[in-house]
Swiss-Prot record:
Assembly mode: Part of the 50S ribosomal subunit.
Presence of keyword rRNA-binding: yes
Stated name of the protein: Large ribosomal subunit protein uL6
Molecular function terms from GO: rRNA binding; structural constituent of ribosome
Family (UniProt): Belongs to the universal ribosomal protein uL6 family.
GO BP annotation list: cytoplasmic translation
InterPro entries given in the database record: Ribosomal_uL6-like, Ribosomal_uL6-like_a/b-dom_sf, Ribosomal_uL6_a/b-dom, Ribosomal_uL6_bac-type, Ribosomal_uL6_CS
Gene Ontology CC: one annotated term: cytosolic large ribosomal subunit
Keywords: Ribonucleoprotein, Ribosomal protein, RNA-binding, rRNA-binding
Free-text function comment from the UniProt entry: This protein binds to the 23S rRNA, and is important in its secondary structure. It is located near the subunit interface in the base of the L7/L12 stalk, and near the tRNA binding site of the peptidyltransferase center.
NCBIfam families noted in UniProt: L6_bact
Length: 177
């Protein structure tokens, strides 16, 4: 049994939650989100809280309902506070610039990398070596951050590349003569 799944997700004031079949919809100040819960998981809206329970006593249902509860909690957090990821660019000549709906990255290649900003995601570049990604969907914010980091992941010798702000790079020592 999942210990996380047992706890109901409270819906704060200012957020409206609806459950239609297996679809959970949340509407709040930061927008509207929906999540389709797996068929092995039962979802109910009771007393201003969303309750998640396994529909069957199978191992799969037990595994899925804790995940479903966490996803519903992310919906509530997304429509109230939103999510944010910060990236840092380290390296000589490495920089980022925002041009309209496109993020232009100079990452040491012979060409600049242009990344089209998806709908529902806001990208800010406070400094040429910092990128801030915000949005109300945790999965999409994380995916965009991972895609941008994937263009030039940090290398272990000098630490050059795009890294998460809270990430520590495991450094290696160079060859010895």
């Amino acid at each position: 049994m999942s210990r996380i799944g047992k706890r109901p997700v409270t819906v704060p004031s200012g957020v409206t939650a609806t459950v239609e079949g297996q679809t959970v919809k949340m509407k709040g100040p930061k927008g509207e989100l929906r999540f389709v819960v797996h068929d092995d998981v039962e979802v109910k809206l009771e007393d201003g809280a969303v309750k998640v329970a396994p529909r069957y006593e199978t191992k799969r249902a037990q595994a899925l309902y804790g995940t479903a509860r966490a996803q519903v909690a992310n919906l509530v957090a997304g429509v109230t506070k939103g999510f944010e990821k910060k990236l840092e660019i380290i390296g000589v000549g490495y920089r980022a610039a925002l041009q309209g709906k496109s993020l232009q990255l100079a990452l040491g290649y012979s060409h600049d990398v242009n990344y089209a900003v998806p709908e529902g995601i806001t990208i800010a570049v406070p400094k040429p070596t910092e990128i801030t990604i915000t949005g109300n969907d945790a999965q999409r914010v994380g995916q965009v951050a991972a895609e941008i980091r994937g263009y030039r992941p940090p290398e272990p010798y000098k630490g050059k590349g795009v890294k998460y702000a809270d990430e520590t790079i495991f450094r290696k020592e160079g060859k010895k003569k």
